[in-house]
Amino acid sequence: MPAVQRAFAGFTNSLEESAFPAFENRSNLRYTPEDELHDLICVGFGPASLAIAVAIHDALDGTDPSLAEIPGLESRTPKVAFLEKQPQFAWHAGMLLPGAKMQITFMKDMATMRNPRSEFTFINYLHQKNRLVEFANLNTFLPARVEYEDYMRWCASWFEEVVSYSQEVIAVNPQKSANGEISVFEVVSKNLLTGQVETRRTKNVVIAAGGKPNITAPFPQNHPKVVHSSKFSYISKQILKDHQAPYKVAVVGNGQSAAEIFDFLHANYPNSQTRLLIKGGALRPSDDSPLYALHLLLPSSDYGLHSAVSMKSSTHRVPR
């Protein structure tokens, strides 16, 4: 049973705050019973939804002036829930290869560019984990991907009270009011552990379910030796057990994941015949120029986030 269900089994409105179980890190958001009207439900709890949760926490905490005037936050804590299909928080867990580093600076974490005073900055994470001095001595802005995933897990742990894991959303149904306008949404989810179907009502919905692995034709969809990059670190241990064996491996694609897998195979399987198959004539570096980065940080890019927290009846799809 997920942590939230265990923590709040038998929950009633008569419970006092002191009756709540203690969380090691606890955000400013509070659990909302399923039968109450929510202000916001996020479908999926990856980096996009986590960033929304952090922004709402900072707004309630008063540490982020840019969110201080969002309607509704000054009078009460919003009723928010996050529904996640996975049994726990995970970010590209199948791609956490040894030695793989982030491609962007840690400054672009869950909070720093928006609110450097937030508890959820990568710097504060390092401080809390007694890793600040060690990381500073690395003389880099690019943390290991494994450490950055642990940072996001640490951030996610603050919101256990409002996240329901093992919940697969199967429908989002708009509900019209008497005048014909959409006033609320009905979010239907299935508990993957019990099979129970649950329904919640909300004024706003954010769809942040992430992408689905796609193995394109002509490759077979369910062949044991045709592996999508999102599952590589799991399955490679099963089908590439001998690091000295003369395997023949083809890596198809020209993105960052393909390049990292190719490099990993070349370094760890010296006798393997590994080929990188790409459509173009050469690999292209990612666009990390200052101009491109500035475009991503323009205020207009925050439209989805600000609209989601402003308590207007709406639905948004954001990348994950």
Model-predicted regions and their roles:
Residues 101-134:
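Flavin (FAD/FMN) cofactor-binding and adjacent substrate-gating region
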Residues 129-143, 184-188, 246-248:
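Helix-loop-beta segment of a Rossmann-like dinucleotide-binding subdomain
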Residues 166-170, 192, 231-232:
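Conserved SAM/SAH-binding loop
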Residues 165-185:
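A conserved short coil-to-beta-strand element within the FAD-binding core of flavoproteins
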Residues 12-28, 198, 204-274:
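Glycine-rich dinucleotide-binding loop and its adjacent helix/turn
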Residues 31-81, 249-271:
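N-terminal Rossmann-like FAD-binding beta1-loop-alpha1 element of flavoenzymes
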Residues 64-69, 76-77, 90, 95-96, ...:
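Dinucleotide-binding/catalytic capping subdomain of oxidoreductase cores
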Residues 134-154, 164, 313-320:
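Short beta-strand to alpha-helix junction loop
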